[in-house]
Amino acid sequence: MGDWNNSDAVEPIFILRGFPGLEYVHSWLSILFCLAYLVAFMGNVTILSVIWIESSLHQPMYYFISILAVNDLGMSLSTLPTMLAVLWLDAPEIQASACYAQLFFIHTFTFLESSVLLAMAFDRFVAICHPLHYPTILTNSVIGKIGLACLLRSLGVVLPTPLLLRHYHYCHGNALSHAFCLHQDVLRLSCTDARTNSIYGLCVVIATLGVDSIFILLSYVLILNTVLDIASREEQLKALNTCVSHICVVLIFFVPVIGVSMVHRFGKHLSPIVHILMADIYLLLPPVLNPIVYSVRTKQIRLGILHKFVLRRRF
């Protein structure tokens, strides 16, 4: 591809390639992704509606699950428009301003997911290690402040990224590797010195995903230590069972993130399609699987869904 310099352009335009080399199956892939988005949308909306309707679920743990569901909706909807435009409508062009906005939302929701998972780990820590103080520590006001802090942190760390990208010139082509805009994907097209942006991005990842994962791990070390001090084995299993759903969603989020990082750092020899699929998985897997995990593993939510969609229709 020839050089593409936007120095004189009013606004540069990027080309979203979707799945390079698999253009002949884009229509079939669009069906699969539409189904995945539909599952994510219906699952998270169901979780939100059940928690909203059932007064017995108006508790700290379920409020955090609601925040996670809202974030998962945002994460899936941030990639949906361009994904379907590329795969379904064969419309790969995207203006730079729209691209910057999309990557801002994608990365904000990603970091917000990590923040919410950390808050949920804190919820489990307080519930198991300090059960008598649980209602007084995690009040509605405190939960609201935690949610706001998570949002502000995510917005704050991501906001400089598109602001820096707006001042860059791009002379290494205009084709992006994915069906949506990602920070590193846009950055590699720049002919401006991008070390500041690149270093900032690395620092943000370490300070958010890295620190969050360490504190989540630490919380479970403390939880396990408390559980082992419980005399009754039945009570031990009961306490641990309340953490299973959260552990599952933590793995669903962090395992693909680690996989993407490993492939990006050490998988230069791999086919580009592997990198693309890994990015798609890490963005789409949590919104699709999280509501399924909570529907299957959390008894109160499962009963709420049955009451809302099955029992009410019978009567």
UniProtKB/Swiss-Prot annotation:
Query: What InterPro entries does the annotation carry?
Result: GPCR_Rhodpsn, GPCR_Rhodpsn_7TM, Olfact_rcpt, OR51/52/56-like
| Entry's transmembrane regions | 28-48, 57-77, 102-122, 142-162, 199-219, 240-260, 276-296
Keyword field: Cell membrane, Disulfide bond, G-protein coupled receptor, Glycoprotein, Membrane, Olfaction, Receptor, Sensory transduction, Transducer, Transmembrane, Transmembrane helix
- Under the GO molecular function aspect, what terms does this record hold? G protein-coupled receptor activity; olfactory receptor activity
Q: Which Cys pairs does UniProt list as disulfide-bonded? A: 99-191
What Pfam families does UniProt report for this protein, alphabetically? 7tm_4
**What superkingdom does the record give?**
Eukaryota
Q: Where in the cell is it found?
A: Cell membrane
Q: Which GO terms describe its cellular component?
A: plasma membrane
Task: Kindly report every residue range on the membrane side named Extracellular.
Answer: 1-27, 78-101, 163-198, 261-275
Q: How does it sit in the membrane?
A: Multi-pass membrane protein
* Residues carrying covalently attached carbohydrate according to the record: 5
Regions of this protein lying in the Cytoplasmic compartment: 49-56, 123-141, 220-239, 297-315
Its biological purpose is as follows:
Odorant receptor.
Q: Which family does it belong to?
A: Belongs to the G-protein coupled receptor 1 family.
The name under which this protein is listed is Olfactory receptor 51L1
Species the sequence originates in:
Homo sapiens
